[in-house]
UniProtKB/Swiss-Prot annotation:
PROSITE patterns: TOPO_IIB. Homodimer. Heterotetramer of two Top6A and two Top6B chains. Its cofactor is Mg(2+). One of its GO terms (biological process) is DNA topological change. It catalyses: ATP-dependent breakage, passage and rejoining of double-stranded DNA. Keywords: ATP-binding, DNA-binding, Isomerase, Magnesium, Metal-binding, Nucleotide-binding, Topoisomerase. The keyword Disulfide bond does not apply. This is Type 2 DNA topoisomerase 6 subunit A. GO terms for molecular function: ATP binding; DNA binding; DNA topoisomerase type II (double strand cut, ATP-hydrolyzing) activity; magnesium ion binding.
Length: 360
């Protein structure tokens, strides 16, 4: 067992020890965990990311619901202890199904077990990967002038993310910290929400023309994708820009990359890239380019109003853009730029926006 895994195991056992000590002292056991809401995140000046504040939620056995939560946590810790000792791993989905045999500690649905794993991350200051818990989702793909070194079952190999891959690109592994950056000729990184737009840039040779590393986000990005973007920015000193659809859900995708997500604010210093810049699609672009658009739904309007009270978006840029979007009552997709031809996005829109941002 690696040293970091030994420390992780000690931290997990420490939680159970704390519960036991409270019960031995005749106390009702309880745990205090950071509240995971937008009202409990604060800006860390040193790391420039959003992290949890001082508000705590109490998991107490005083209530039946609280007692079940603590019971389920002890079962999960017991499972993780065995898994670490055997050097095995499991997925979040497998953990949910394994609980079928735990009687009263069985999870009713997977989101419940997922949240409990997040609780353990917060309580121990370790990541789920240190518990040997893997996500279901794959990491996204990368294509561009970057050479990486990775360990495989057959040993160490080097891969050039342009020359040694097909149009699908290089698959980002679950544990990004296991890959090493060997060298690169890149000038910036562009993270793209949709597969269709990612394919358009690749087909048009955008990565070659502008020495860009293209990262496909696949919608809301996996942790591995966000970790890769942070490493490319901090270790290789490459500017990172994010290109999404023009709707509130896509702005949240940008926020998870740049500021850190509310759900995983305990990992913001590891996953977030505060230097990341938003390319578009902006509401300003919808008006400026007269893009094909859909009317905002009630859910869209509700989400936009929520953004106006989200501290991560507390800037003049976002206030102006969100208020404009509410005013025009429209949203547009990235691919709406095809109104002006398939090459417009790579020949006109992106060069103009990247020049405005000082990237090219």
């Amino acid at each position: 067992m690696k040293e970091i895994e030994r420390r992780c195991l000690r931290a997990l056992i420490g939680i159970v020890q704390n519960i036991y000590d409270q019960m031995k002292a005749g106390q009702v056991p309880e745990l205090h965990i950071a509240t995971r809401t937008k009202y409990n995140i604060e800006f860390n000046e040193e790391s420039e990311v959003w992290v949890y504040g001082d508000r705590k939620s109490v998991r107490s056995a005083k209530t039946v619901k609280g007692a079940y939560r603590i019971l389920k946590m002890t079962y999960v810790i017991g499972f993780l202890k065995e898994q670490l000792n055997l050097n095995k791993s499991s997925t979040l989905r497998e953990l949910y199904y394994i609980s079928e045999g735990w009687g009263a500690a069985k999870f009713e649905e997977q989101p419940e077990s997922d949240r409990l794993v997040e609780d353990l991350e917060i309580l121990t200051n370790f990541q789920r990967e240190h518990f040997h818990i893997r996500p279901e989702e794959d990491g996204a793909t990368v294509i561009g002038p970057l050479r990486v070194r990775e360990e495989t079952r057959r040993g160490v190999r080097e891969i050039h993310c342009q020359d040694d891959v097909g149009e699908g690109g290089y698959q980002i592994p679950v544990n990004v910290d296991k890959i090493e950056f060997v060298d690169h000729d890149a000038k910036f990184v562009i993270a793209i929400e949709t597969g269709g737009m990612r394919d358009r840039l690749v087909e048009n040779g955008f990565d070659e023309k502008y020495d860009a590393i293209i990262v496909h986000l696949k919608g809301q990005p996996a942790r591995s994708t966000r970790r890769l973007l942070r490493r490319l920015n901090t270790e290789l000193n490459l500017p990172v820009v994010v290109f999404t659809d023009g709707d509130p859900w896509s702005y949240r995708i940008f926020a998870s990359v740049a500021y850190g997500s509310i759900k995983s604010a305990h990992l913001s210093e590891y996953l977030a890239t505060p230097a990341a810049q938003f390319v578009g699609i902006r509401p300003t672009d919808i008006v400026k380019y007269d893009l094909p658009a859909d009317k905002l739904t009630e859910e869209d309007i509700k989400a936009l109003n929520a953004i106006l009270t989200d501290p991560r978006f507390d800037s003049e840029f976002w206030k102006k853009e969100v208020n404009l979007q509410l005013e025009i009552n429209k949203k547009s997709e990235q691919q709406a730029l095809a109104k002006y031809g398939l090459d417009y996005v790579t020949d006109v829109y992106l060069p103009e926006r990247l020049s405005e941002l000082g990237v090219i």
